[in-house]
């Protein structure tokens, strides 16, 4: 059971009720609401030095704060830290919140953090005044170290913490990232109003990194190609830009599961690009494809992680929300339930969302069946489905852009920090 984070105490709404009677100028009141709704906005590229490190300095002096820099790297050489020249450093936290944990890749990174804190683990520290090393007995046999991730209910986090005797902590990094990256798009004229859209396609499905740990995207593309759904808005590279491997080589590890996958991909003319787009550019930190999205019944989100026991949603899930669209998520089991825990709504009253509770071995096939059942509908029927989804789409848009989601994340972040040992 996922703990509920659907907090119904939007601080913005409370402030509106308290202060509005005392505001005389309507224009001033509109501006005030605008400013208040952005008071908590975290600049995600400054979250370590402007949010976490000042909090630890003020509330948990003696902690070292580690993270990976620059964004997107997770190798041992990317580990950096903040520390104190005045306080006795007796504990530390490693904020590993940007990327999912892959045990076959990232154990060396975690070992690097242990090495950098060898003095704390041995109960020995350098007296910076005298220059002498001193041994400090640790109260109650306390073992130092926290691992802060953006993976909820994660078997990999449990393994790493058990292996290194770390304590786990969690917050939704990618929720904050999406709020920062997609802020302001509600004040543009790039996104066609929901009520004015004419639906001509079943889905939009951007694909960029498709090999290595992302091969579930190849599985999804396999079903799209095999089931004749290429007429939708789809992109697919001929070479994975991250792994630098051709798609035809990347599908070979999947032959045992899909014996005809090579021939299915060989029949496609790759790469498949969106109009006016080449080389499948990275669009993580901004919205795009506005025209294609406005024509599509739903956005097919192929998340970063789609297997294993964990909840790990990224900014990809929030693209359709910020674009004002319904969505289907190719993610881990329970991804929709996890998202609903943050106050968003999904589309179980519009189409079958039982795929969310399906096991890893069949979830992508269930999603493909859902997409095919929608794809065979008439254009008129797809428009009716989109119109039925409008209430949920508008709720999600408002929750994302009008402070509700941010308020939930802020409470979650502060509650998490309060649980860190002194």
Model segments located where?
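Basic polycationic patches enriched in arginine
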Residues: 5, 37-38
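Leucine-biased recognition of intrinsically disordered, low-complexity hydrophobic segments
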Residues: 15-18, 40
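Pol beta-like nucleotidyltransferase catalytic core
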Residues: 40-287, 292-301, 307-314, 318-422
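Short hydrophobic alpha-helical segments enriched in small aliphatic residues
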Residues: 12, 23-25
């Amino acid at each position: 059971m996922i703990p509920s984070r659907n907090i119904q105490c939007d601080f913005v709404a409370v402030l509106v009720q308290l202060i509005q009677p005392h505001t005389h100028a309507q224009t001033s009141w509109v501006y005030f609401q605008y400013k208040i709704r952005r008071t908590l906005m975290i600049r995600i590229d400054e979250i370590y030095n402007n949010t976490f490190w000042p909090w630890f300095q003020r509330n948990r002096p003696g902690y070292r704060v580690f993270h990976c820099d620059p964004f997107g790297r997770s190798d041992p050489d990317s580990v950096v830290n903040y520390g104190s020249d005045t306080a006795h450093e007796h504990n530390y936290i490693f904020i590993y919140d940007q990327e999912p944990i892959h045990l076959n890749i990232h154990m060396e990174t975690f070992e690097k953090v242990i090495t950098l804190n060898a003095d704390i683990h041995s109960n020995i520290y350098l007296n910076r005044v005298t220059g002498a090393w001193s041994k400090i007995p640790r109260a109650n046999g306390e073992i130092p170290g926290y691992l802060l991730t953006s993976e909820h209910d994660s078997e990999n986090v449990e393994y790493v913490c058990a292996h290194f005797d770390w304590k786990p902590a969690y917050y939704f990094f990618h929720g904050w990232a999406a709020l920062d990256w997609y802020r302001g798009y509600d004040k543009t004229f790039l996104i066609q109003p929901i009520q004015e859209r004419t639906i001509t396609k079943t889905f939009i499905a951007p694909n960029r990194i498709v090999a290595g740990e992302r091969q579930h995207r190849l599985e999804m593309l396999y079903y799209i190609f095999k089931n004749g759904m290429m007429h939708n808005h789809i992109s697919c590279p001929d070479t994975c830009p991250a792994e630098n491997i051709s798609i035809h080589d990347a599908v070979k590890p999947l032959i045992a599961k899909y014996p005809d996958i090579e021939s299915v991909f060989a029949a496609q003319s790759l790469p498949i690009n969106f109009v006016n787009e080449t080389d499948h550019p990275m669009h993580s930190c901004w919205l795009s494809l506005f025209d294609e999205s406005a024509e599509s019944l739903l956005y097919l989100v192929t998340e970063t992680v789609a297997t294993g026991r964990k909840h790990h949603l990224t900014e990809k899930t929030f693209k359709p929300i910020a674009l004002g669209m319904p969505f289907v998520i190719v993610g881990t089991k329970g991804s929709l339930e996890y998202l609903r825990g943050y106050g968003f709504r999904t589309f179980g009253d519009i189409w079958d969302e039982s795929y969310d509770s399906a096991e890893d071995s069949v979830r992508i096939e269930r999603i493909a069946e859902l997409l095919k059942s929608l794809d065979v509908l008439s254009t008129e029927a797809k428009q009716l489905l989109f119109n039925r989804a409008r209430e949920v789409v508008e709720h999600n848009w408002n929750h994302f852009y009008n402070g509700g989601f941010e308020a939930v994340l802020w409470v979650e972040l502060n509650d998490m920090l309060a649980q860190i040992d002194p």
